[in-house]
Every structure is written in structure tokens, then in C-alpha cells.
Amino acid sequence: MHLFRLILSLVIICWFIELSYSAEPTKRPNFVFIVSEDNSIHYLRLYGNKLGITPNIERLADNGLTFNHAFSGAPVCSVARSTLATAMHAPRVGFQYHRKSALASLPPGVKPWSQVLRENGYYTTNNAKTDYNFNVNRKEVWDMSSNKATWRNRPNKAMPFFHMQSFADSHESRLHFPLKQMETPTKTSPDDVMLQPYFPDTPIMRYTKARYYDRIRVIDSQVGKIVNQLKEDGILEDTFVFYFGDHGGVMPRSKGYAYESGLHVPLVVRIPENFKKLIDHKRGTRTNGFVSFIDFGPTVLNLASISVHKELDGQAFFGKGVSAADLANRDEVFGHADRFDEKFDMVRTYRKGKWKYIRNYQSYYADGLQNNYRYRQLAYDNWRNLYRAERLNPVQRQFFERRSVEQLFNLEKDPHEVTNLAADPAQSKRLAEMRGLLKNKMKSINDLSFYPENRMVTTALNDGVAFGREHSKQISRLSDLADTALRPFSEVKQALASSLQSKGALRRYWALKVCSNFGEKAKSLAIAAMPLLNDKNLMVRVRAAEFLGSIKAVDPMPTLYGVVNNAETEQALMIAFNTIVYLRDQVGHKYDPEKVKLKFNKGEVYRRVQYLAGTEPNTNY
């Protein structure tokens, strides 16, 4: 009897012990994102540039995985950071414009993934930049978001956390210095700098790039401080540390442009000792697998054993169900660039392995079209002045001239994307393949940039994803119309003439953009386009003036004055003023500021008005 009681007691005790252990939460990893603003892989020693001295980042790599192919999706802050925060493609949701003129809403049930972490027991902090282009209650996303935010404030030291730390010492603004500043020596010698082939070799260019290398050193020291804090707290080996740039930059032709210099970012993930079993990679190695910002959220959620919402566009690159071989086999990525500040564009890119395809939907706009903030950098102004003085070689001139409608680059042989192979007969099959991959991608996400921004803002932003699905056939038809620019003009002339007379304003709008892409080749359609200068749709009028003005069939300015004086929205004004700047600066038409009487003059519109009036403040001289 006593023996029975003893055995029963032991069984009960063991049962309680097992119950108590099973009731304890499973230990989960912490996550720290260290983000440097505006820098691509091209400025770090870890990626082969000896002037990018970053010992702290290299120590992360020694204990983690270095990604040779990580991409931001967009080459500018708010769009890239919104992509990072949501794990969704910006043109699919409607937050692809920077600066935003209106906030997009995420689909029902979709939340920023840091909010999902918080709802699953994580302490979430952000120090401090957000720059979101979508509606969000930040108090639901972050326990703390400020320049004082830190994981050290969590109520329970056993509580897992996600902390995002942004550093601005590599930001574009750090290169907005006056000419006199060049008297101050840099730590990096300008004589040691290697300039990209599209840059003129000038003292300003060399000093600017040397100064940027110095900023990277500052970033590295800040990375080291964060890692040391984790060490001091005894949690470094419980924490995945991600270091990356928020997009490329920040010399000219990088930030704001969908070249590798704008999209290809450094990414190093330190693998903690206590959670290395979650990763199918050895510490101190590299991977050639492609990842982008849409993948970061699903990766963190997967490592934290939290399910990923089906609407997210990315896929995990670490954790359960992801092998090193799976990651290594990923070799494709999508990129995009739209209106950034007051400068409009629509560029889409697709990369597969060493091949990069760029589709310029408004190829008649030069890359170097005025953006006031960009041109506060002396190097931009220096470059443009040399172009105007006709002192550049053909490669250096490209930035200020019409682009090709499509571009194809072999990045292995041409890492700076200066030799376009799209017209090379030997690459015709490759071109068709890459063109098809991009087109399929854009159709699969129902790319909302086929709608003018003013139309998208008023009709799509309550739920851009649902709107895209509901209008997928229309988007597909507009995409097909836009792609008539890829065929010989003689083959599409009649179809374009028909579209110019379409009852649908969007078809008239896109037909005119295609005509502008053809330029002089489309001159025979000038008579068909003339009535559209008085179209009932103001944006169609803008595109008619743009096309007819670009071939000098008419003086486009009276039409454009009428549009800007009657436009009711900021978006419509921005589109019209972009066309005015293009026609004045690139084509040579005269602009009279006295003819403009605006109902709205602030923000990006004000920037254009300042520039056209010659009153844009430039503090660099």
C-alpha cells in the first residue's frame, strides 16, 4: 500500500513537472535591424571596395551570412521602407510614389509584420525613421517609436523583441555641402577614388565620393555600438542582427534611379549561436541567392514561428522549410521607380541572374530631368554644367538624353549599365525572355501605375489590391497598348491612330505617351493628336501637348498654362509641371511664369514653380 502511494505520488509529481515545463513559452529569437540610409553595395570593403572600411560590419559577416544579391525594390526611402514594412510590392498596393500625395490602405486583414510580431508577444521598437506611404496606427505597430526607442525598455527581460535602428549619416543630405567645404580634407583621399565610367573626372566628383566613403566609416562605428549593447546585455547570441541599406545611393545616378546603384543593397545577417539550428548556412559564408525587401518580413515571422498572411508578396529566406540550396536557386527580382519628389517617371526592371532588363515607359524623359533635391548636390550640378558645355563623352552624356524604351544589360561584363544590348541581334531571344518575365510580373501584381497618379489617388487607394484585381483586364489592356512602343512604328501606326480616337480617356492618354516614345517617327500622327489639346480630360491634354511639343508641331505652353490654371488636384498639377519642365529644359520651348495663376501652390508643385521661376534656393554656392 505504501509502495503504491509512493509510486502514485512520484507519477503526480512528474506530471506536474512536465506540465509546468510545457506551460513555459518556448524561447524565441530576438531581431535587430540596423539600417543605413542611401547606400548600395558599391561602397563597402565586404563587397570588394577597399575604400569602404567597415570592420564592424565585417565582424557581423564573420559570424553570419553575407548576401551578394539583396535588393530594395525601389531606389528611394518611403517606397522602399513601405515595401519593407508590409512585404508587399508598392505598385500593387498604391504606395509607389515619393513623396506621397495620399496614403494607401492595406488590404483587409493585412498588417505591417512588426505589428504581427507585437500581437504575438514581441516587444517592438523603432529608432526612429518610418516614412510610410500607407495608413497605419503606429501605436499598434510599435511599443515605442522615437529617437529614444530601445529594446532595453521592455517590461520583461525574457520578452523577445524586434528593434529597428536607422542611421542617417550616409543620407543624401550629407553630400549637400557648399563649395567652400572642399577646402576641408577628407579621411579618404580623393586621389584614391575610382569613378564610375558615366561620371566626368572632376575634383568635385572625386571629393564628393571620398566624403561619402567617410560617411560609411561613421555608419560602421554606429553598427558596432549597437552590437556592443547587445553584448553588454548578454543577448547577442539570442539575436539575429540584420545590417542593410534602405536602398542605393547616394552619388548621382543612384538614389532615385532603378539601376543597380539604386536598388542593389548590402545585406549581412549575423546568426546567433543559440539559434543557429534555424539556419541552413554556416557562419562566415556568402550566398548568391536573390532576396528583396518583400522577403524580410516573412523571414522574421518564419524564424519566430508565426504564420505569414497569404496576401504578402515575399517568401522567407531563413527558417523552417528553407534550405541553403533553395535560397541559392533564387535568381530573379523585380524593381520599380515612379514619381520621386516632383520628378515623374515610370520605370520597371527585372533581373534574372546576370541579366538586367529595364523598361522605360516615358523614355523621352532624361534621367537627369530636374529634381530640386538631387541638384542640391554639387556633383549633380557639376555634371550637368559639363553636359551643357558639351564637354562629356557619349557614356557620360547618356544621363541627360532620351533613353531607350527598353534596355538590356549583362551585369557580369557591364556592372555600371552603360552598354545597352537590347538592339543586339545576338540577344534577341534573351530580350524576348526578359521582356516577357517583366510583363508577366506586372500583370500578376496588377501594376497600378498604368493609372495616372491623380486617377489612382481618387479611385484606388482605399484598397489598391482589390482595385487592381477588379480592374485587371483594363490594366492588362493598357499594358498591351503601352508595349506597342516596343514594335516598329509602321506596324502599330493604325492601332495608335485608333486609340487616339478611343472613347476611353486612359487609352487616349497611353496612346499619346506611346507617340512621345516614338518621337519623330510618330510625326504622321500629329494631325490625329491635335484635337486632344482640347480634350475634356486634363491629363489627356497634358500628354497631347507633350507629344506635339516634343516634335515641335505646336507651341505646347498655352495648353499647359490652361491645364495648370484649372487643375483641382496636386497630382494633376505635378504631372503637368513635369511636362512643362521637360519641354522647356530638353526640347527648348519658352515658359512664361506670368501666364500661370495657380489655385494650389505648395509641396512638390511649389518646387516646380520655384525652379521654373529661377528662385529655387541653392545653398551650395
Feature map (PLM): residue ranges:
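Formylglycine-dependent sulfatase
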Residues: H2-L6, L19-L392, R397-F400, P415-G436, ...
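Sec-dependent N-terminal signal peptides
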Residues: L6-W15
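Short hydrophobic beta-strand that contains or immediately precedes a catalytic carboxylate
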Residues: L408-F409
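Long, internal low-complexity/basic segments
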Residues: A23-P29, S36, I41, T66, ...
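C-terminal helical cap and adjacent loop that interface with cofactors, partners, or active-site loops
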Residues: E412
